[in-house]
Swiss-Prot record:
Record organism: Streptomyces ambofaciens
Tree of life domain: Bacteria
Keywords: DNA replication, Plasmid
Nuclease listed as a keyword: no
Example GO BP: DNA replication
Taxon lineage: Bacteria, Bacillati, Actinomycetota, Actinomycetes, Kitasatosporales
Entry protein name: Replication initiator protein
Function: Essential for pSAM2 replication.
Length: 459
């Protein structure tokens, strides 16, 4: 329960929910959603009948549920909107990325991908002007040694000269810049192997999984796992000449090549711009187990999963679309971020096809925060389906339907959307349940770590 006092309306609603005769069932529904902040409400029914005899095998209706509704998880990936669903999304992303690094027989990804050349690369945005930072040595250019959580970190040293328009236009075109980078990367690999671009697919494929991250200054950069496979994907071995060193060298060359650029035409008072990656490029080999010099599979997967649930909120912007600039006042948006949002508003009529104002809450970025090439790994959809199939199998076993042939059972259903979210009192109770679930997860993780440590000592 929260430490602060509840207002009378919330307290009264909380007591109403907690004292209801069907509270236990309501709590069970909330736990099944992961105690999400914004559950989806459905009304309706489902009916299982024997096709031959017409016998009713099972009948379910939401009429018997609390409030006459069934509550489901909202599925929002953003931690700022629904920590519970974001936790599930992060877990799926972790398994997706790690399967592409270590293999997963359940997903038809062989463990031999561990022997393929793999690197973890970070491509950053160029500079749009000096900002307050915290260098490893010395002080910021403003003369201050900023604290790690200083609010001014990432803000422009001189807002009058900072290129806010360039920053949001870069974010807006970052997806295209990534596409050109991957195209150039294949050409660089082919050149180092003495092959033409058309000959390369007969010998090798480039696979990747990536995630976008906003720096405090509001500029986007990409973290990517890049892997070299044989011509048929992860099931085939890449040629002997395809090494980690060759891949790393090709990445650096592709990022720096003039082809890897995106041009934006001039419009009214805005000059023509050509965007390229920043000079801070990091390429690190990925190893199965760490020896202190390379990044490990688990570390990479955890890092990517962490940022898959975030957007631009770490800059202080909103986590939803902005209707009017006045909304920024109500949410105490920092000045630097506000100027980036205002730049989106100002540039929108100059570049209408880029829909900058519609994506102002993302500081201009309009792509997917996490994405992958087709053959890198499994898909998020496949992971969700596996979870749904598991739950369906549990239900069938509980209802004694698993002994019947699927084609002998007729399933009828009718579902209607009935709203979303919690009442004030439900929100407080759900938040308490969510904290308990999170504590249980943390306790379980600590227990697993202790067990692994003990097994390591015993070995």
């Amino acid at each position: 329960m929260p430490d602060t006092l509840l207002d009378p309306t919330t307290l009264g609603d909380l007591l109403r929910v907690a004292s209801a005769p069907d509270y236990a069932r309501w709590e069970d529904q909330i736990r099944r959603t992961g105690a999400g902040a914004n559950p989806i409400h459905l009304t309706g029914w489902t009916l299982h009948k024997d096709k031959t005899t017409g016998e009713t095998l099972h009948h379910y209706t939401t009429a018997v549920e609390p409030g006459g509704r069934l509550r489901l998880a909202c599925g929002n990936r953003r931690a700022s909107r629904c920590p519970s669903c974001a936790w599930t999304y992060a877990g799926d992303t972790y398994h997706l990325i790690r399967a592409g690094l270590a293999g997963d027989d359940r997903r038809d990804i062989p463990a031999t991908v561990r022997d393929h050349p793999r690197v973890f690369a970070t491509l950053t945005a160029p500079s749009f002007g000096p900002v307050h930072n915290r260098p490893d040595h010395g002080t910021c250019r403003c003369g201050t040694r900023h604290a790690p959580d200083a609010p001014e970190l990432g803000a422009a040293l001189d807002p009058t000269t900072y290129d806010y328009a360039g920053a949001v236009l870069f974010n807006n075109h970052a997806g295209q810049l990534w596409q050109r980078f991957t195209t150039r990367l294949r050409r660089e690999i082919a050149a180092r192997a003495g092959l033409s671009r058309r000959e390369l697919p007969d010998c090798l494929r480039v696979s990747y999984g990536k995630v976008a991250e906003f720096q405090k200054r509001g500029a986007l950069h990409f973290h990517a796992v890049i892997r070299l496979d044989g011509p048929e994907g992860p099931d085939t071995t890449p040629p002997a000449w395809a090494t980690v060193a060759l891949l790393a060298d090709a990445i650096r060359a592709a990022a720096a090549h003039s082809y890897t650029s995106v041009s934006v035409p001039a419009a009214e008072d805005q000059p023509a711009r050509t965007f390229r990656w920043g000079t801070q490029l990091d390429v690190r080999p990925v190893k199965a187990f760490g020896d202190g010099s390379d990044i490990t599979e688990q570390a990479v997967a955890s890092y990517v999963a962490k940022y898959a649930t975030k957007a631009a909120e770490n800059t202080g912007t909103l986590d939803r679309r902005i209707g009017e600039l006045s909304e920024l006042d109500r949410h105490d948006v920092p000045d630097h971020t506000r100027r980036l949002v205002e730049a989106c508003k100002m540039l929108d009529p100059l570049y209408p096809e880029r829909r900058l104002w519609a994506w102002a809450h993302m500081l201009g970025f309009r792509g997917h925060f996490s994405s992958k090439s087709r053959r890198y790994s499994t898909t998020l959809g496949a992971l969700r389906q596996a979870r749904a199939d598991y739950r369906a199998a549990q239900e069938h076993a509980a209802l004694a339907l698993d002994d019947r042939e699927p084609d002998t059972v007729l399933v009828l259903a009718d579902w209607q959307y009935a709203g979303h979210g919690h009442t004030p009192g439900e929100s407080v109770l759900a938040a308490t349940i969510a904290r308990n679930l999170q504590l249980n997860r943390e306790t379980a993780r600590e227990a697993v770590r202790d067990q692994l440590d003990q097994e390591g000592v015993a070995a």
